[in-house]
Swiss-Prot record:
This is Endophilin-A homolog. Residues 1-21 are annotated as: Membrane-binding amphipathic helix. Expressed in neurons and posterior intestine. It comes from Caenorhabditis elegans. Residues 170-238 form a coiled coil.
Length: 381
């Protein structure tokens, strides 16, 4: 910098300090110019915040945005241009649905429905990528161009105007020669005119900026139209899936026993008499009568068999007086101290342990068994 230029910068700094301290009064610009400056500052801040807000709307995850910015920086350092796209939430949801739809398989109606939904959400993710490209091309790029070019030129003229105004006020305060004052005044007027015209051009371009805002709305509207159509198609597909699943006959399922393929626990060697044996013994016993009390001989009744009474054979008289129950199901003892029996077995009740277990006796063997497996014939006293 030359000596004259250094002196000029020193004079400007001196004038600025004097104005700040209140020792000098700056040259006032007209109200129209001041209002235009205010509107330009507002426009600059508007574009800065609007671009940031739009990017956050398109890519809402800040951690992912930071990661992508780091990848872009590393790609520039390495000299590569390969970058991964922003992971859309619709695409991530589609991956989850497809994963479990494949695990359930084509035999599952739910699995096929999940695959249908995954395909639809993947289409929605592609549509959102198209919306991002559209918004970037027709909204973000024009705003960024306005900020980096027109507004940058406006601020350049404003900065130059401020410097020439300080130079003019400094020479005016120092009462320089007329030719220097005239030259400083001409430069001040020129800078003020350039700055004002550049601000006017930016502020009078509302039509273009409104058109850019409309492009943003149109891109969003087109996105929602296409995604709504995709969801309506998916809704119809799932309706058909529901009808097919409801029309299919319901399959019956019988659970397999845990011990179906294993040998059961060996039973006691004692075998309870078969119903036919019990019937034969009862018939044989009924063929004889006790001798009369007057000492007469034994009389034999003619053998006859009337068959078992309805509902099965009644227990002997001695058993009817004792608390007893009849087994409703087979019960296999699972631990020591339990009493196993077959369906229809008569069990002598010894005691009730609690609300879930009885203690009983069968063929001289005593043990525990569940209450729900038997029907009480003669209750405990």
């Amino acid at each position: 910098m030359s000596l004259s230029g250094l002196r000029k910068q020193f004079n400007k700094a001196n004038q600025y300090l004097s104005e700040t301290m209140g020792a000098a009064e700056p040259t006032k610009l007209d109200d129209v110019f001041n209002e235009m400056e205010k509107n330009v500052d507002t426009t600059y801040n508007l574009i800065t915040d609007l671009v940031a807000g739009t990017n956050e709307y398109l890519q809402p995850n800040p951690a992912t945005r930071a990661k992508m910015a780091t990848q872009v920086a590393l790609s520039k350092v390495r000299g590569t241009t390969k970058t991964s796209p922003y992971p859309q939430t619709e695409g991530m949801l589609a991956d989850v649905m497809q994963k479990y739809g494949q695990q359930l398989g084509d035999n599952s109606d739910l699995g096929k429905s999940l695959n249908d939904a995954a395909e639809t959400y993947r289409q929605m993710a592609d549509i959102k990528y198209q919306m991002e490209d559209n918004v970037k091309q027709n909204f973000l790029d024009p705003l960024t161009h306005l900020q980096n070019n027109e507004l940058k030129d406006v601020n350049h003229h404003r900065t130059k105007l401020k410097g020439r105004r300080l130079d003019y006020d400094c020479k005016k305060r120092q009462q320089r020669r007329d030719d220097e004052m005239i030259q400083a005044e001409e430069k001040l007027e020129e800078s003020k005119r350039l700055a004002e015209m550049s601000m006017f051009n930016v502020l009078s371009n509302d039509v273009e900026q409104i058109s850019q805002l409309r492009a943003l709305i149109e891109a969003q509207l087109d996105f929602h139209r296409q995604t709504a159509q995709c969801l309506e198609n998916l809704q119809q597909q799932l309706g058909h899936r529901i009808k097919d699943a409801a029309a299919r006959p319901r399959e019956e399922h019988v659970p397999l026993s845990v011990l179906a393929n294993e040998s059961r626990t060996p039973r006691s060697s004692f075998r309870s008499p078969a119903p036919s044996d019990m019937s034969h013994n009862s018939t044989a016993a009924a063929a004889f009568k006790m001798p009369p009390q007057n000492g007469g001989g034994i009389t034999q009744a003619p053998p006859s068999y009337q068959g078992p009474p309805p509902g099965g054979l009644p227990p002997p008289l001695s058993q009817q007086q004792k608390p007893q129950c009849r087994a409703l199901f087979d019960f296999d003892a699972q631990s020591e101290g339990e009493l196993d029996f077959k369906e229809g077995t008569l069990i002598e009740l010894v005691s009730q342990i609690d609300e879930n277990w009885y203690e009983g006796r069968v063929n001289g063997k005593t043990g525990l068994f569940p209450v729900t497996y038997v029907q009480v014939l003669v209750p405990l006293k």
